[in-house]
C-alpha cells in the first residue's frame, strides 16, 4: 500500500468538496469553493509514472459556475462530466477539439484540453449537493437542498420527474446498478427508495438515523456493484457512529459498519467485486481476512465487496463485506472532514478529498484487496440474481405511434434549446418609434448615429464592461450551529444605467409615437429617455419609467410620467374622489419642448419621418387701459418634414403629451383639454375637456386613441367613428390588501399605460404588475405579477436577453423588479406553484393575443403535466383542442352555448394537438395509453370532418379586450389603415359633412366629390 498527497492538486487554497475518477482512467476531476471544476491528468498521480511534465498535470479549468462546486461526476462512457453547484445549476461538459483557453486576467496558463459546457440543467431552487448517473448514462439524478431529487433526461436535457417526499435537505443520491431503484438520504433522518418504473416511493426507512448527532455537508450513500447492499451514512449506534447497510428487497438494516468517532459523510463502493487469493492461513491472517479466522476452501472462491468511508473525524476506513473490522484505517491525512471518495477503474487506487483543500491517493496491492472480478464475471453474477437487467428501468412501448411521437418530442426539445441559445447570443433589431430634435433623411440619420457612437464609444464600452462583471457578488454570510460559514449569493438586480443614447435608429414599419412632458415629483423612478430642448436650443435628456413600450426597444419615445392614485376613504372610487400626485425624475419646466417622429412607409421606405413639435412660449399681453401687462402662456405646435414646415398652430396653456400616426395627431394640455388634428393640421373636432391634465397617451396604427388623466380616468376613443369605446377609472386597481401599511393601502403608482398589441389598454404599476382591460368581461385582468416566486419557470425569463414577446417583456420587468428587492430569493416549490404559473401564463398570452407565446406556454404546460403524469388535466387539455364528439357537431352548432371554435389565435386546434401537444405528451411513457386514445380520436375526426375554411385575417375595427372572433395568423401584422382607406363605412349613412358618424379627415371631401360626379353623369344621361 502506497499513500501520497500531491501538493499541486488544489483550488486556490479553498475547500475541495468533490472528487471523481474518469471511468477510462485517464483523468480525475475536482470541484471546490473557487467556483471551478478542475480536470487533472491521471498519469501525474500514477504510482508507476512519476516523471510526467508538470505542465500537463492540470488539463483544464471549467469556470461556468457562479457558486461553490459541490459535486462532480463522470458519465459511465467517460465522455461527459457533470457538476452541481450552489448556483442551483447543473453543468454538463464535454471535451471539444482544439486547444484550451484561459480566463482573461486570471494569470493562469492556457488549458491543455478544450472542455465546453454542452448542457445546462436548471430547475432546482437551492444548492445542488449530489449527482449520480444512471447505469446506461441516459438519465442523471440530482439531490438538492430544496428537499427534492430531480431526474434529468440526458438526451433532451429536460427534467423527467421531480421526486418529492423528504421533509428536509436532500444531501445524497445514488442509482441502483441494476437500474430499478434510486436511493436518497436527507437531513430529515430518512432514506427513501424510489422505483424507476413509475417514480413512485418503494420504501421509506427512518429508524436507524433517529439518534444521529450533529450535521454534515453531505450524506453520500452508496450502492454495492452487485446491487444487493445499500450503505447509508450518518448513523449512530451508541457509543460510535455507524454506516447502516440496507439489504435489497426488504430494505431492512442487515448490519452496521461501526467504529468512527464522528458522523460518516461519504461511503463509496469499489466498482468491482473481489475474490481472495488462494493462500495459507498464515498469509490470510496477515492481510486481516475476517480477523484471521477464515479457512481456505470454498470461502476463497466467494466474492465480496470493498467499501471506503470518509468521516467528520478526518479519517478514512476501508472495509470488506467479509470482515467485521476495517481492512485499512487512514488517520492524520487531513486537517478537516473527508467529504468525497472515488475508486480508480482498476479498483486498486482510492482518491479522497477534504475540506482542508487537499487530496490524497492510496494505492493498494492485489494481495491486500484480493483479485478483482472481470466485468464479464460481474455481469454473470448480476444476471444469475436478477436476470437480464438491460432496459429493465424503462417502460415498454405499447404502440408504434409512441416511438414516432417520442422522436418528434426529442426534436421539439432540441429545437427549443437551440432557439434559446440563439436568442441569448443575438441582439435582435426591432422596429422603433424615435424622439429626437431633428428630422433628417435616413441616410444622414445613420451617419449621425455612427458619429455619435464613435464619440461616446469609450463611455458606453466602459458602462457595458461594468455591467458584465460577475464579481464581486453580493453575498449573505451567516454561521451554522456547527460553526461553519454559509455564504448565499443574493440575486443580482439590473443596474440603473445612465444611458444618454439618442434614438436615431431605423424603423422598419409604421408605428405610432407618443411623448409627454415632465412634471413635479420625486426622483426615485427609473425613467426612459425622451428628447427635450429649452429655449436656448440646448438639448435635455429626460428619462422615464416604462421599460417596454410598443416601440419595443429599451430607449423609447413614449410616456414619461408616473401617476400616483390614492383612493379617498369612504368613497366609491369614481372620478373626483381620488387623491392624485405625479412623480418623475426632473422638475417641471415651462421651457420644455416635446418632439415625436412618425414614419409612414406609404411614401416609400426611404421617405423621411414627419415630426410634430410642441414648444412652450410666453409673451406679454398689453391690455388697453390697464396699467400693467400680463404674461400669457401658450404652446406652438408645428409639423415638419425634411426641415419644411407643413403646418403649425397655437394652443393656450402647456402641452403635456403628444401622440400621432399617419392618420391624426393629438395634443393633451395641463388644463385638461385635448386637441385632435388631421394629418394636414386641421382641428378635427372642438377641444375635448377631460377635467384634469393628461398624463399618459397612446395610439395604435389606425384610429384608436388612449388617454389617462391626472384623476385616474382612462378613455379609449374610436376617432374615425367619433365614439368612446371605453371610459373607466384606474381606481379599481388600488390595492385593498389588509396586510399593507396605512400609508400604502389604497394607493397605486402607475408607470405606464399603453395600448397592447391586441388593442386593449395595458397598465403597468410601479410594482411591475401589469393589467389588461377586457371589454367582454368589463374588468381588469392581471397578466403579469410576482405571485409565483417558487415556480420552476420563473427563471426561464432571461433578464439579459431581448424578450421575444409582449408577455415575456412584462415578466422580465417583474423579475428585474423582484431582483432589486433586498433579501429576495427563490423558495421551494412542491409543484403546485409551477403548474399554477404555467396556467396563468397560458391564459395571459391568450388575453394578450400573442400566438407565439401562447404556443410556448402551451408546450411547457403539457410537458409539465406529462412529467407529473397528471392524466386528468392532460385529458382536459386534449379534449378542449379536439372539439365536440364526432357526429355531434351539428347539434352543438345549433346551440350557441355549445359552439366550439376550431381555431385559437388563428391556428387550427387540431394542428396544435397533432404537432405540439401529442408529441409533448410522449415524453413520459406513463401516459402513453392516454396518448394512444387521443391519437385514435384525432384520426377519427380527421376522417369525418370537412375542410374548414381558414379564418379571416381581418382585424376587428375596435376591440379593447378579450379574444376577437376573427384573429390573425401567427406572425402577421394588422393592415395599416390610412385616411383614404377607412376600416368600415356604413352604406346606410352617406358620408358627408352633415354626418357626425365620420371624422372629417379627408374622407368627406373625397366622398362628396364622387357624389357630385355621379349627379353630373346622371344629368347628362337624362339630357341626352
UniProtKB/Swiss-Prot annotation:
<dbReference type="InterPro" id="IPR015943">
    <property type="entry name" value="WD40/YVTN_repeat-like_dom_sf"/>
</dbReference>
<dbReference type="GO" id="GO:0030875">
    <property type="term" value="C:rDNA protrusion"/>
</dbReference>
<keyword id="KW-0678">Repressor</keyword>
<dbReference type="GO" id="GO:0005730">
    <property type="term" value="C:nucleolus"/>
</dbReference>
<feature type="region of interest" description="Disordered">
    <location>
        <begin position="983"/>
        <end position="1024"/>
    </location>
</feature>
<feature type="repeat" description="WD 5">
    <location>
        <begin position="214"/>
        <end position="256"/>
    </location>
</feature>
<keyword id="KW-0677">Repeat</keyword>
<dbReference type="InterPro" id="IPR055410">
    <property type="entry name" value="CAF1B_HIR1_beta-prop"/>
</dbReference>
<comment type="subunit">
    <text>Component of the HIRA complex made of UBN1, UBN2, ASF1A, CABIN1 and HIRA. Binds to histone H3.3, UBN1, UBN2 and ASF1A. Interacts with AS1.</text>
</comment>
<dbReference type="InterPro" id="IPR011494">
    <property type="entry name" value="HIRA-like_C"/>
</dbReference>
<dbReference type="GO" id="GO:0005634">
    <property type="term" value="C:nucleus"/>
</dbReference>
<feature type="repeat" description="WD 7">
    <location>
        <begin position="333"/>
        <end position="374"/>
    </location>
</feature>
<feature type="repeat" description="WD 8">
    <location>
        <begin position="570"/>
        <end position="609"/>
    </location>
</feature>
<keyword id="KW-0805">Transcription regulation</keyword>
<feature type="repeat" description="WD 6">
    <location>
        <begin position="279"/>
        <end position="329"/>
    </location>
</feature>
<feature type="compositionally biased region" description="Basic and acidic residues">
    <location>
        <begin position="1007"/>
        <end position="1024"/>
    </location>
</feature>
<dbReference type="GO" id="GO:0006351">
    <property type="term" value="P:DNA-templated transcription"/>
</dbReference>
<feature type="repeat" description="WD 10">
    <location>
        <begin position="689"/>
        <end position="727"/>
    </location>
</feature>
<comment type="function">
    <text>Histone chaperone involved in maintining knox genes silencing throughout leaf development. Involved in heterochromatic and euchromatic gene silencing, especially upon salt stress. Involved in gene expression reprogramming during dedifferentiation probably by modifying histone H3.3 recruitment at the nucleolus. Contributes to maintenance of silencing of pericentromeric repeats and certain transposons.</text>
</comment>
<feature type="repeat" description="WD 12">
    <location>
        <begin position="869"/>
        <end position="910"/>
    </location>
</feature>
<keyword id="KW-0853">WD repeat</keyword>
<comment type="similarity">
    <text>Belongs to the WD repeat HIR1 family.</text>
</comment>
<feature type="repeat" description="WD 2">
    <location>
        <begin position="64"/>
        <end position="103"/>
    </location>
</feature>
<feature type="repeat" description="WD 3">
    <location>
        <begin position="123"/>
        <end position="162"/>
    </location>
</feature>
<dbReference type="InterPro" id="IPR019775">
    <property type="entry name" value="WD40_repeat_CS"/>
</dbReference>
<feature type="repeat" description="WD 11">
    <location>
        <begin position="745"/>
        <end position="790"/>
    </location>
</feature>
<dbReference type="Pfam" id="PF07569">
    <property type="entry name" value="Hira"/>
</dbReference>
<protein>
    <recommendedName>
        <fullName>Protein HIRA</fullName>
    </recommendedName>
</protein>
<dbReference type="InterPro" id="IPR001680">
    <property type="entry name" value="WD40_rpt"/>
</dbReference>
<keyword id="KW-0804">Transcription</keyword>
<keyword id="KW-0156">Chromatin regulator</keyword>
<feature type="compositionally biased region" description="Polar residues">
    <location>
        <begin position="421"/>
        <end position="437"/>
    </location>
</feature>
<dbReference type="InterPro" id="IPR031120">
    <property type="entry name" value="HIR1-like"/>
</dbReference>
<feature type="repeat" description="WD 4">
    <location>
        <begin position="165"/>
        <end position="204"/>
    </location>
</feature>
<feature type="repeat" description="WD 9">
    <location>
        <begin position="649"/>
        <end position="687"/>
    </location>
</feature>
<feature type="repeat" description="WD 1">
    <location>
        <begin position="10"/>
        <end position="50"/>
    </location>
</feature>
<keyword id="KW-0539">Nucleus</keyword>
<feature type="coiled-coil region">
    <location>
        <begin position="923"/>
        <end position="946"/>
    </location>
</feature>
<keyword id="KW-0175">Coiled coil</keyword>
<feature type="region of interest" description="Disordered">
    <location>
        <begin position="409"/>
        <end position="460"/>
    </location>
</feature>
<dbReference type="Pfam" id="PF24105">
    <property type="entry name" value="Beta-prop_CAF1B_HIR1"/>
</dbReference>
<dbReference type="InterPro" id="IPR036322">
    <property type="entry name" value="WD40_repeat_dom_sf"/>
</dbReference>
Amino acid at each position: 500500500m502506497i499513500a501520497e498527497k500531491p501538493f499541486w492538486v488544489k483550488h486556490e487554497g479553498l475547500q475541495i468538496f468533490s472528487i471523481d475518477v474518469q471511468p477510462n482512467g485517464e483523468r480525475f476531476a475536482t470541484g471546490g469553493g473557487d467556483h471551478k471544476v478542475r480536470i487533472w491528468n491521471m498519469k501525474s498521480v500514477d504510482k508507476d509514472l512519476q516523471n510526467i511534465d508538470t505542465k500537463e498535470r492540470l488539463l483544464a479549468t471549467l469556470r461556468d459556475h457562479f457558486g461553490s462546486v459541490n459535486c462532480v461526476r463522470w458519465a459511465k462512457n467517460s465522455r461527459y462530466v457533470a457538476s452541481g453547484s450552489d448556483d442551483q445549476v447543473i453543468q454538463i461538459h464535454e471535451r471539444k477539439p482544439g486547444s484550451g483557453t484561459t480566463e482573461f486576467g486570471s494569470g493562469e496558463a492556457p488549458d491543455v484540453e478544450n472542455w465546453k459546457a454542452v448542457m445546462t440543467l436548471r430547475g432546482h431552487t437551492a444548492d445542488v449537493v449530489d449527482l449520480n448517473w444512471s447505469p446506461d448514462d441516459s438519465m442523471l439524478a440530482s439531490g438538492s437542498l430544496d428537499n427534492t431529487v430531480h431526474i434529468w433526461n440526458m438526451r433532451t436535457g429536460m427534467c423527467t420527474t421531480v421526486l418529492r417526499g423528504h421533509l428536509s435537505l436532500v444531501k445524497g443520491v445514488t442509482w441502483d446498478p441494476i437500474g430499478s431503484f434510486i436511493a436518497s438520504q436527507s437531513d430529515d433522518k430518512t432514506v427513501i427508495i424510489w422505483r424507476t418504473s413509475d417514480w413512485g416511493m418503494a420504501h421509506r426507512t427512518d429508524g436507524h438515523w433517529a439518534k444521529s448527532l450533529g450535521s454534515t455537508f453531505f450524506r453520500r450513500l452508496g450502492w454495492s456493484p452487485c446491487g444487493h447492499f445499500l450503505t447509508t451514512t450518518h448513523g449512530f449506534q451508541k457509543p460510535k457512529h455507524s454506516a447502516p447497510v440496507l439489504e435489497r428487497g426488504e430494505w431492512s438494516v442487515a448490519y452496521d459498519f461501526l467504529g468512527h468517532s464522528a458522523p460518516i459523510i461519504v461511503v463509496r463502493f469499489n466498482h468491482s467485486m473481489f475474490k481472495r487469493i488462494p493462500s495459507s492461513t498464515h498469509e490470510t491472517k496477515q492481510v486481516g481476512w475476517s480477523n484471521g479466522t477464515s479457512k481456505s476452501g470454498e470461502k476463497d472462491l466467494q466474492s465480496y465487496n470493498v467499501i471506503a468511508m470518509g468521516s467528520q473525524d478526518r479519517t478514512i476506513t476501508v472495509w470488506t463485506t467479509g470482515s467485521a473490522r476495517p481492512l485499512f484505517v487512514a488517520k492524520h491525512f487531513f486537517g478537516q472532514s473527508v467529504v468525497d471518495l472515488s475508486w480508480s477503474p482498476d479498483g486498486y487506487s482510492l482518491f479522497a478529498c477534504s475540506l482542508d483543500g487537499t487530496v490524497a491517493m492510496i494505492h493498494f496491492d492485489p494481495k491486500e484487496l484480493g483479485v478483482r472480478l472481470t466485468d464479464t464475471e460481474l455481469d454473470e453474477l448480476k444476471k444469475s440474481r436478477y436476470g437480464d437487467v438491460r432496459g429493465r428501468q424503462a417502460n415498454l412501448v405499447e404502440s408504434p405511434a409512441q416511438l414516432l411521437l417520442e422522436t418528434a418530442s426529442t426534436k421539439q426539445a432540441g429545437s427549443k434549446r437551440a432557439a434559446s441559445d440563439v436568442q441569448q447570443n443575438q441582439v435582435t433589431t426591432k422596429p422603433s418609434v424615435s424622439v429626437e430634435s431633428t428630422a433628417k433623411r435616413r441616410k444622414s440619420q445613420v451617419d449621425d448615429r455612427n458619429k455619435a457612437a464613435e464619440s461616446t464609444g469609450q463611455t458606453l464600452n466602459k458602462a457595458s464592461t461594468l455591467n458584465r462583471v460577475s464579481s464581486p457578488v453580493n453575498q449573505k454570510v451567516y454561521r451554522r450551529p456547527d460553526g461553519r460559514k454559509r455564504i448565499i449569493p443574493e440575486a443580482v438586480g439590473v443596474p440603473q444605467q445612465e444611458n444618454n443614447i439618442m434614438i436615431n435608429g431605423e424603423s422598419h414599419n409604421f408605428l405610432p409615437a407618443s411623448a409627454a412632458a415632465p412634471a413635479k415629483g420625486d426622483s426615485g423612478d427609473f425613467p426612459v429617455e425622451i428628447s427635450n430642448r429649452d429655449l436656448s436650443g440646448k438639448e435635455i435628456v429626460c428619462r422615464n419609467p416604462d421599460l417596454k413600450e410598443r416601440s419595443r426597444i429599451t430607449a423609447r419615445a413614449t410616456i414619461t410620467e408616473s401617476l400616483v392614485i390614492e383612493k379617498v376613504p369612504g368613497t366609491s372610487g369614481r372620478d373626483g374622489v381620488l387623491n392624485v400626485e405625479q412623480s418623475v425624475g426632473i422638475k417641471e419646466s415651462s421651457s420644455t419642448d416635446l418632439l415625436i417622429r412618425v414614419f409612414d412607409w406609404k411614401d416609400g421606405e426611404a421617405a423621411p419621418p414627419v415630426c410634430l413639435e410642441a414648444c412652450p412660449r410666453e409673451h406679454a399681453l398689453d391690455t388697453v387701459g390697464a396699467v400693467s401687462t400680463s404674461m400669457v402662456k401658450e404652446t406652438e405646435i408645428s409639423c415638419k418634414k425634411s426641415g419644411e414646415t407643413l403646418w403649425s398652430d397655437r394652443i393656450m396653456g402647456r402641452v403635456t403629451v403628444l401622440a400621432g400616426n399617419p392618420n391624426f395627431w393629438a395634443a393633451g394640455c395641463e388644463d385638461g383639454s385635448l386637441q385632435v388634428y388631421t394629418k394636414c393640421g386641421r382641428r378635427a373636432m372642438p377641444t375635448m375637456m377631460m377635467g384634469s391634465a393628461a398624463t399618459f397617451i397612446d395610439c395604435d396604427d389606425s384610429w384608436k386613441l388612449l388617454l389617462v388623466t391626472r384623476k385616474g380616468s382612462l378613455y379609449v376613443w374610436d376617432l374615425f367613428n367619433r365614439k368612446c369605446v371605453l371610459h373607466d377609472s384606474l381606481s379599481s386597481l388600488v390595492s385593498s390588501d389588509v396586510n399593507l401599511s396605512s400609508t400604502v393601502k389604497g394607493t397605486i403608482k402607475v408607470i405606464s399605460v399603453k395600448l397592447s398589441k391586441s388593442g386593449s389598454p395595458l397598465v403597468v404599476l410601479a410594482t411591475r404588475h401589469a393589467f389588461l382591460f377586457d371589454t367582454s368581461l368589463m374588468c381588469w385582468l392581471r397578466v403579469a405579477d410576482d405571485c409565483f416566486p417558487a415556480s420552476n419557470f420563473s427563471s426561464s425569463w432571461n433578464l439579459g436577453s431581448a424578450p421575444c414577446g409582449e408577455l415575456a417583456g412584462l415578466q422580465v420587468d417583474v423579475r428585474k423588479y423582484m431582483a432589486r428587492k433586498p433579501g429576495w430569493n427563490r423558495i421551494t416549490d412542491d409543484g403546485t406553484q409551477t403548474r399554477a404559473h404555467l396556467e396563468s401564463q397560458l391564459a395571459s398570452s391568450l388575453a394578450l393575443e400573442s400566438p407565439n407565446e401562447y404556443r410556448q406556454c402551451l408546450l411547457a404546460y403539457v410537458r409539465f403535466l406529462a412529467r407529473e403524469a397528471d392524466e386528468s388535466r392532460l385529458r382536459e387539455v386534449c379534449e378542449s383542442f379536439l372539439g365536440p364528439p364526432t357526429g355531434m357537431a351539428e347539434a352543438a352548432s345549433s346551440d350557441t352555448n355549445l359552439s366550439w371554435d376550431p381555431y385559437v389565435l388563428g391556428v387550427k386546434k387540431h394542428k396544435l394537438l397533432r404537432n405540439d401537444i401529442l408529441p409533448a405528451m410522449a415524453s413520459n411513457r406513463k401516459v402513453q395509453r392516454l396518448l394512444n386514445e387521443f391519437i385514435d380520436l384525432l384520426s377519427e375526426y380527421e376522417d369525418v370532418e370537412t375542410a374548414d375554411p381558414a379564418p379571416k385575417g381581418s382585424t376587428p375595427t375596435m376591440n379593447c379586450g378579450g379574444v376577437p372572433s376573427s384573429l390573425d395568423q401567427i406572425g402577421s401584422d394588422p393592415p395599416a389603415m390610412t385616411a383614404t382607406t377607412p376600416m368600415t363605412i356604413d352604406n346606410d349613412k352617406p358620408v358627408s359633412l352633415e354626418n357626425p358618424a365620420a371624422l372629417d379627415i379627408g374622407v368627406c371631401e373625397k366622398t362628396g366629390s364622387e357624389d357630385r360626379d355621379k349627379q353630373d353623369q346622371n344629368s347628362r344621361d337624362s339630357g341626352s
